[in-house]
């Protein structure tokens, strides 16, 4: 009983020092809430990061494709897509691809009128497939195509392993052997020859030059008409005659002519058609492509690995669930973009020390 009386006396004698509520020092952490606006809390965990620009990398757990053909030295992706001699090789399969050539200005072999068609898009089209292979057989016999017989034209800028001159493996430059005369539009059917249910990408085009060269090669110096049709898409062209400055490609002879190159996508079992006059570049080997590969704009080389590939920041490792800064396309295990930093309150709402209770 005595012990109890002593305890009560201690409490009573120190009543002016008892505080109510939570005591803490002034908190520097402020969070915005949905119901109370800005609130001071005793602790927070940052949920956002602001990345810095870095090199691009291989995506963790995924095959990442940089160049279409890594082993094709001194070749642009357009060289590979058109199967330029010395630029033919294996394209590795990949679930993710880096678009590193935005506007290739040359493809070797022969001066191309890039802006007449969507040919600049061909490497990017191929890049969007997981599996890509070039057919081992030609899709048509170009020498015996309608309007022939033809000899196959070559360029000194296209040396191959057996000759100082050649041409793209995807096309045959059809030059009449004997019947160098004007012709009405001719039609050739392009069969589907891929064997695994892939999309078939068929490359074709036409050559045009000045009037003297057109007469010499084809016996007709007038503008020529061309049409391709496949998978419900039809494209028309009329060739331009003359007006081209001489241009040299990769050490070959100066060329007064130009070629226009296009492609058509054929679905499994579907036949395409090409209607043409003189100067046609008939399709030969075709691309067989399947699966999907995610494509993102970036740069080479790919160094190391990263959780995420971001068009503005390169390779990112996911240290926080959200990020601020520049918003752009990203692929992989990426943080989510937010306008302002996010914080998770892991403490309590800050309360100032309660006023001391005074004895009356």
Curated annotation (Swiss-Prot):
Homotrimer of disulfide-linked HA1-HA2. This is Hemagglutinin. GO terms for biological process: fusion of virus membrane with host endosome membrane; fusion of virus membrane with host plasma membrane; symbiont entry into host cell; virion attachment to host cell. It is found in: Virion membrane; Host apical cell membrane. In natural infection, inactive HA is matured into HA1 and HA2 outside the cell by one or more trypsin-like, arginine-specific endoprotease secreted by the bronchial epithelial cells. One identified protease that may be involved in this process is secreted in lungs by club cells. Palmitoylated. It is a single-pass type I membrane protein. The keyword Repeat does not apply. It holds the Pfam family Hemagglutinin. It comes from the Viruses. Residues 1-15 form the signal peptide. Glycans are attached at residues 40, 74, 160, 179, 246, 317, 346. The keyword Signal applies. Transmembrane segments: none annotated. Keywords: Disulfide bond, Fusion of virus membrane with host endosomal membrane, Fusion of virus membrane with host membrane, Glycoprotein, Hemagglutinin, Host cell membrane, Host membrane, Host-virus interaction, Lipoprotein, Membrane, Palmitate, Signal, Transmembrane, Viral attachment to host cell, Viral envelope protein, Viral penetration into host cytoplasm, Virion, Virus entry into host cell.
